[in-house]
């Protein structure tokens, strides 16, 4: 059976040898070039492959069409992935008629993602293992073929556990590969309700939090000890690395981080304490704990913890243009709640942000982005993160005012992008699900889906192509001039303060606001083209949490990324949304204030939006990037969103009636 192997690390070497022993005909091996900044405690797949006489490649992007074609020419029966660090496209996976299999270092569905061995120790697990599973478009989510369990002892480090997992992998493959070769194997679907996902770890994750209990600190020490960068703390500005430690039961009533004794070196945790067995200063030798205390001048009752200067770190400054809009005002609320941000905002009105006026961390000016260019340039220079949320984003305006859409959505935003390049500022740009246009994929993928729009005489696409062109310009600035950016694509976000009923009265609003207006006024609900178009509705709170995590940008994982933010499980047609809204309306406590329901009315899109409109049948996001980069999943169902949105507008309408 002809096999192509994607492999790296010790597990990759174990996999290659197991395949050879099982009689697989390995056509080629794809691996990675070694990173000079990485501690290579593991064997080289390239070297082992060469010694086995195998053909080896290390492409930067194996999913490039040229590499896909080369793999197709090899005509593999089966594909194996052993600790290969890049996702393989569906096009590659579909080239193997007998299937594609991945070996993962955990007992799936637990610990999907990166560094599962380290994470298992950090979290204090007592058991892990290896899983061989079918590969799918979603990372580590395919049906399970086989698993081998591994016990984690209290004294195991990541290196010791890695050796155990390597032995388990060899045992699993020796037993399972012959069954795959014969086609005589069964699979078990993963239980998604039990799935957990963890991202990559970096050296900074080794910072010790002495407010944790002693067992938690000890778990961190053994998870990141050699060959990893180590767990660390600071004495003032000086770094102290702890390589080996043991938990102690009694902290003697000391505050977390307080040195209880120096011989042995014992440091208090919130519960219990840690005895430092070995460690070193940043530029010192590997020594015993008591010797480390002497070298660093550590004395009893001194406190260690975060770096002294880190404790006086200033808040990040975020500039939000269009701060009074739907996303802008909800994002402001989330940032202020966090407490680590100063928000500077501009908009032509303030109706949605009046609740923030007077907050010392919220700074607002009423203004127009096309006029107040000096203020904008100054604040881009002053702030750390820029979010230009100003845009015309209501479908009727695409055909009614196409030139204004282009001028604001493209030209004015291009100026802001160029200021960010000029002053080397990070921009988080709101792309749109509209850029996918009439894409025919079942799920719209940020990295692979085609962006398909209609002919020139269909002017509704001017919004889509304006946004798409800005996406491409921003990407080019990132590639050529080092612009730090993230593009996010909202999929039908809904919630309180989405547009307002006055904008709905002139047709310039999103679908749910227009539907609510029909109910409030007792006019027929208009279903454009029968309302059969399907969308995936996302609660504003889910969306804002994802956007907040993009702003946080832990480990800089969001730099240079495009991220769909939507809820693929909340798919419904506009007609179904209207029926759900009607049901909530009839059950609402304020129902008696409004006229009887006037029924549904089917209309053609041209009579509603005007000449030049064209609609899309479905728009479902792939959210694998959001899951991987943000550790985010939407949780709120459409009905809850509809109820909260309806309640907001009905209470506003009743208040308006009372003021007349």
UniProtKB/Swiss-Prot annotation:
Chain sites annotated for binding UDP-alpha-D-glucuronate: 393, 398, 432-433, 460, 492, 526-535, 613
Transmembrane stretches, start-end: none
GO BP, sorted A to Z: lipid A biosynthetic process; lipopolysaccharide biosynthetic process; response to antibiotic
Catalytic activity as recorded in UniProt: UDP-alpha-D-glucuronate + NAD(+) = UDP-beta-L-threo-pentopyranos-4-ulose + CO2 + NADH; UDP-4-amino-4-deoxy-beta-L-arabinose + (6R)-10-formyltetrahydrofolate = UDP-4-deoxy-4-formamido-beta-L-arabinose + (6S)-5,6,7,8-tetrahydrofolate + H(+)
Cross-referenced InterPro entries: Arna-like_SDR_e (IPR045869), Bifun_polymyxin_resist_ArnA (IPR021168), Epimerase_deHydtase (IPR001509), Formyl_trans_C (IPR005793), Formyl_transf_N (IPR002376), Formyl_transf_N_sf (IPR036477), Formyl_transferase-like_C_sf (IPR011034), Lipid_A_modif_metabolic_enz (IPR050177)
Pfam family, one: Formyl_trans_C
Family per similarity comment: In the N-terminal section; belongs to the Fmt family. UDP-L-Ara4N formyltransferase subfamily.
Name of the protein: Bifunctional polymyxin resistance protein ArnA
Originating organism: Proteus mirabilis (strain HI4320)
Gene name as annotated: arnA
């Amino acid at each position: 059976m002809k096999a192509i192997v994607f492999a790296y690390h010790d597990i990759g070497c174990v996999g290659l040898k197991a395949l050879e022993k099982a009689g697989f005909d390995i056509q080629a091996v794809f691996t990675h070039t070694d990173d000079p900044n990485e501690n290579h405690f593991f064997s080289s797949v390239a070297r082992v492959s060469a010694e086995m006489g195998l053909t080896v490649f290390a492409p930067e992007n194996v999913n490039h069409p040229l590499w896909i074609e080369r793999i197709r020419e090899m005509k593999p029966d089966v594909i194996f992935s052993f600790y290969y660090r890049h996702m393989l496209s569906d096009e590659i996976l579909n080239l193997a008629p007998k299937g594609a299999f991945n070996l993962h270092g955990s007992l799936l569905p637990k610990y999907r993602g990166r560094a599962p061995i380290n994470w298992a120790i950090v979290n204090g697990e007592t058991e892990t293992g290896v899983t061989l599973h079918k590969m799918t478009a979603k990372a580590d989510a395919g049906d399970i073929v086989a698993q081998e369990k591994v016990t984690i002892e209290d004294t195991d480090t990541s290196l010791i556990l890695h050796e155990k997992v390597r032995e388990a992998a060899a045992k699993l493959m020796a037993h399972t590969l012959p069954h795959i070769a014969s086609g005589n194997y069964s699979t078990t679907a993963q239980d998604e309700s039990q799935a957990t996902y963890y991202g990559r770890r970096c050296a900074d994750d080794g910072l010790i939090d002495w407010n944790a209990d002693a067992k938690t600190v000890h778990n961190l020490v053994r998870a990141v000890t050699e060959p990893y960068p180590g767990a660390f703390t600071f004495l003032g500005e000086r770094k102290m690395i702890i390589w080996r430690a043991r938990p102690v039961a009694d902290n003697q009533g000391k505050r977390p981080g307080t040195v209880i004794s120096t011989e042995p070196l014992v440091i208090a945790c919130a519960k219990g304490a840690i005895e430092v067995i070995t460690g070193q200063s940043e530029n010192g030798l590997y020594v015993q704990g008591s010797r480390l205390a002497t070298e660093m001048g550590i004395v009893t009752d001194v406190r260690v913890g975060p770096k002294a200067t880190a404790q006086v770190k200033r808040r990040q400054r975020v500039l939000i243009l269009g701060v009074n809009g739907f996303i802008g005002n909800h994002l402001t609320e989330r940032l202020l709640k966090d407490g680590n941000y100063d928000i500077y905002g501009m908009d032509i009105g303030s109706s949605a942000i009046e609740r923030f006026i007077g907050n010392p961390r919220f700074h607002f000016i009423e203004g127009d982005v096309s006029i107040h260019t000096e203020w904008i340039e100054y604040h881009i220079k002053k702030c750390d993160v820029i979010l230009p949320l100003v845009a015309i984003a209501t479908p009727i305006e695409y055909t009614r005012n196409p030139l204004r859409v282009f001028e604001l959505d493209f030209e004015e935003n291009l100026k802001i992008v160029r200021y960010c390049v000029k002053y080397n500022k990070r921009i988080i740009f709101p792309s749109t699900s509209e850029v996918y246009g009439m894409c025919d994929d079942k799920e719209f993928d940020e990295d692979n889906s085609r962006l398909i729009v209609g002919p020139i005489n269909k002017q509704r696409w001017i919004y889509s192509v304006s946004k798409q062109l800005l996406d491409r310009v921003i990407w080019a600035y990132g590639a050529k001039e080092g612009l730090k950016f993230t593009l996010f694509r909202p999929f039908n976000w809904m919630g309180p303060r989405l547009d307002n009923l006055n904008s709905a009265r002139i047709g310039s609003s999103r679908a749910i606001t227009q539907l609510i207006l029909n109910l409030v006024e007792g006019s027929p609900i208009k279903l454009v083209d029968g309302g059969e178009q399907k969308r995936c509705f996302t609660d504003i709170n889910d969306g804002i949490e994802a956007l907040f995590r993009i702003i946080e940008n832990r480990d800089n994982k969001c730099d240079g990324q495009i991220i769909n933010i939507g809820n693929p499980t909340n798919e419904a047609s506009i007609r179904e949304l209207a029926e759900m809204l009607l049901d909530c309306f009839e059950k609402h406590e304020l129902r008696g204030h409004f006229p009887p329901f006037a029924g549904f009315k089917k209309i053609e899109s041209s009579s509603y939006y005007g000449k030049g409109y064209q609609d899309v049948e479905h728009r479902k996001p792939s959210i694998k990037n959001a899951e991987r980069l943000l550790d985010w999943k939407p949780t709120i169902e459409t009905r809850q969103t509809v109820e909260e949105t309806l309640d907001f507008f009905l209470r506003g309408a009743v208040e308006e009636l009372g003021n007349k």
